[in-house]
Swiss-Prot record:
The keyword DNA repair does not apply. Autophosphorylated. Residues 1-29 form the signal peptide. Glycans are attached at residues 107, 118, 153, 187. This is Somatic embryogenesis receptor kinase 2.
Length: 628
């Protein structure tokens, strides 16, 4: 018997190693993952913005600042304003389906890789406000889908490639504030652009710069104006009247000259042209209780979106702390979003939908801002941060969350999610329930945040709505395997969040390997329960200031919520009732009986293979007592 157990243990270890190496291979063998890993290795990241770019996190589509389409192929890399330095890598050219490369406002140096010309699906290339040097690659002229090209405020040198004039889709061009030289093309797509696109390049020449190129004939000035001779009229004007009339005519001509010049420019150029200018400030309007802020108002509130005001970063964008003119503190979420025709109306519709989800345990949307270049959401500022920060990032001066507060958080967040599922029309699926997305107000009441953003983000193809996002440990099995989410996906995430509340630990933590423990919080908890070590899984910060029976009850709810089959998980409304003391004992007893029967069937089917255990099986052996 001992030999059997040893062999079974060895087989389980072998299977575990194979699964681990398989998951690593899936990420490392992914060409796109390799390319992004090369980029991360070549960049200096003082703020750990790229911390989630880990090969153990399934694939690049689960990493922050990366967006994928339905086929789990990278379509967007958003690393703007991230304080990154270092150089880009040629491997970026392997991201064949990439549409948006956002690297603006960093400290990146070196050349712009010519391999970016292989990104034939690229729509937007934003490299402005860096320290790039060298020429603009001629290969960028192969990007025939490019609409936005911003290379301004760098140290680029050499001529403007003529190949860029072949990009007929180009709508926004900014090459200003560089060290470019030579003639500015004025044919093809470049006929659309005005001098502002090329400003502050002292060695550029050509008609658009008002500086003739060497060897070219000077620009012909307009012919001088010769006033017609003054002919006395029959009525006779005095000399004073003639002089006054001449002065008036001259003044009129002086004021009309700019208008005439602009009219000449419009006749010379096509009627419609584009260039990058600061976004127009929207008029302040109210949609019910929802306020529409101007961009300028939010820029002032956040000190121009200063890094020092960043509260957090996520897959939807960055969150900034801000102070409005009346002194009110707010949290401003700056979304990353694809601009599509009709997107403004869609955005406003979805914003209004989110604003109608009003509940004590939901983060209330206070307002929004929409401009041609920005989408922002304004929320009340939550002084106590998130549950995750209170559990794992609290300063020594801050007391740990008491057990009673943790129970209050469990019930409040369940009520908020239940409202999203059962009382919103259409229902809202959160898709990313975890401790980091549960905020705490001044009274430590749980407030569910980031709901509705998956619908709000107006992407044609995005992992936010149809493919896996987030990190291992929070993701329901069916979501991980199919990319399809449901309200039961939220239930699973909620169950993991309960385990975070109880243990104070992360849902996925490689540091647990140091003690030969499971990296997945769910498996780690189950292992301790099977060994009847309940006291070892409770957060040490509680220092035994909890009731064991209440901990057992919360664990039971968590295990019911994290069953592998979504059909067997309770609805959030049922979870609320169980936490309120209604029906947990019956639900737990019923579930245990089903588990016993299922295991008996499995053992009869595999009489010599007692090692075949699903991660959700054999939980009756934990011998958790029922609610008391």
């Amino acid at each position: 018997m001992g030999r059997k157990k040893f062999e079974a243990f060895g087989f389980v270890c072998l299977i575990s190693l194979l699964l681990l190496f398989n998951s690593l291979w899936l990420a490392s063998s992914n060409m796109e993952g390799d390319a992004l890993h090369s980029l991360r290795a070549n960049l200096v990241d003082p703020n750990n913005v790229l911390q989630s770019w880990d090969p153990t996190l399934v694939n690049p589509c689960t990493w922050f600042h990366v967006t994928c389409n339905n086929e789990n192929s990278v379509i967007r890399v958003d690393l703007g304003n991230a304080d990154l330095s270092g150089q880009l890598v040629p491997q970026l050219g392997q991201l064949k389906n990439l549409q948006y490369l956002e690297l603006y406002s960093n400290n990146i140096t070196g050349p712009v890789p010519s391999d970016l010309g292989n990104l034939t699906n690229l729509v937007s290339l934003d490299l402005y406000l860096n320290s790039f040097t060298g020429p603009i690659p001629d290969s960028l002229g192969k990007l025939f889908k490019l609409r936005f090209l911003r290379l301004n405020n760098n140290s680029l040198t050499g001529p403007i490639p003529m190949s860029l004039t072949n990009i007929m889709t180009l709508q926004v061009l900014d090459l200003s504030n560089n060290r470019l030289s030579g003639s500015v093309p004025d044919n093809g797509s470049f006929s659309l652009f005005t001098p502002i696109s090329f400003a502050n390049n002292l060695d550029l020449c050509g008609p658009v710069t008002s500086r003739p190129c060497p060897g070219s004939p000077p620009f012909s000035p307009p012919p001088p104006f010769i006033p017609p001779p003054i002919v006395p009229t029959p009525g006779g004007y005095s000399a004073t009247g003639a002089i006054a009339g001449g002065v008036a005519a001259g003044a009129a001509l002086l004021f009309a000259a700019p208008a005439l010049a602009f009219a000449w420019w419009r006749r010379r150029k096509p009627q419609e042209f584009f260039f990058d200018v600061p976004a127009e400030e929207d008029p302040e309007v109210h949609l019910g209780q929802l306020k529409r802020f101007s961009l300028r108002e939010l820029q002032v509130a956040t000190d121009s979106f200063s890094n020092k005001n960043i509260l957090g970063r996520g897959g939807f964008g960055k969150v900034y702390k801000g102070r409005l003119a009346d002194g009110t503190l707010v949290a401003v979420k700056r979304l990353k979003e694809e601009r599509t025709p009709g997107g403004e109306l869609q955005f406003q519709t979805e914003v209004e939908m989110i604003s109608m989800a009003v509940h004590r345990n939901l983060l209330r949307l206070r307002g929004f801002c929409m401009t041609p270049t920005e989408r922002l959401l304004v929320y009340p500022y939550m002084a106590n941060g998130s549950v995750a920060s209170c559990l794992r990032e609290r300063p020594p001066s801050q007391l740990p969350l008491a057990w009673s507060i943790r129970q209050q958080i469990a019930l409040g967040s369940a009520r908020g999610l239940s409202y999203l599922h059962d009382h919103c029309d259409p229902k809202i699926i959160h898709r990313d329930v975890k401790a980091a997305n549960i905020l705490l107000d001044e009274e430590f009441e749980a407030v569910v945040g980031d709901f509705g953003l998956a619908r709000l983000m107006d992407y044609k193809d995005t992992h936010v709505t149809t493919a896996v996002r987030g990190t291992i440990g929070h993701i329901a099995p069916e979501y991980l395997s199919t990319g399809k989410s449901s309200e039961k996906t939220d239930v699973f995430g909620y169950g993991i969040m309960l385990l975070e509340l109880i243990t104070g630990q992360r849902a996925f933590d490689l540091a647990r390997l140091a003690n030969d423990d499971d990296v997945m919080l769910l498996d780690w908890v189950k292992g301790l329960l099977k060994e009847k070590k309940l006291e070892m899984l409770v957060d040490p910060d509680l220092q035994s200031n909890y009731t064991e029976a209440e901990v057992e009850q919360l664990i039971q709810v968590a295990l019911l919520c994290t069953q592998s089959s979504p059909m067997e998980r309770p609805k959030m409304s049922e979870v609320v009732r169980m936490l309120e003391g209604d029906g947990l004992a019956e639900k737990w007893d019923e579930w245990q009986k089903v588990e016993v029967l299922r295991q008996e069937v499995e053992l009869s089917s595999h009489p010599t293979s007692d090692w075949i255990l699903d991660s959700t099986d054999n939980l009756h052996a934990m011998e958790l007592s029922g609610p008391r």
